[in-house]
């Protein structure tokens, strides 16, 4: 069993009063620190699976666990990076970056140096 484990995941939506199967018996194990890529055509269920793993949607049947805990809702200790940038417009760039550090419980006094490092790395310091 992986750090992230998907077992017999099934997801249906209702469309025009009929069930539409998006995920069918999906099984997947991802080890901690492992990098994977989900590939498939548009509409094949990639985003639905990721939303279920993140806890934004529940599977119709089957189970998803992270570090042995069943996923039933989004968890503050896990950070999701969205395809469409989801910056909080009332926060600065630095403050948006700090959200991830807060969720990982990085000490407040260490955050400015970390933020500065990555802002410079991606060229946002100009």
What are these regions (language model features)?
Residues 36-37, 80:
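Short beta-strand immediately N-terminal to the Walker A/P-loop
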Residues 94-102, 112, 116:
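Short helical segment in ABC ATPase nucleotide-binding domains corresponding to the A-loop/adjacent helical element
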Residues 77, 83, 92-94, 99:
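Beta-to-alpha transition at the N-cap of a short helix in the ABC ATPase nucleotide-binding domain
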Residues 62-73:
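Conserved ABC transporter NBD signature motif
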Residues 107-126:
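Conserved ABC ATPase "signature" region
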Residues 39-41:
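The feature captures the beta-strand-to-loop junction immediately N-terminal to the Walker
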Residues 54:
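Helix-to-loop junction immediately C-terminal to a conserved catalytic motif
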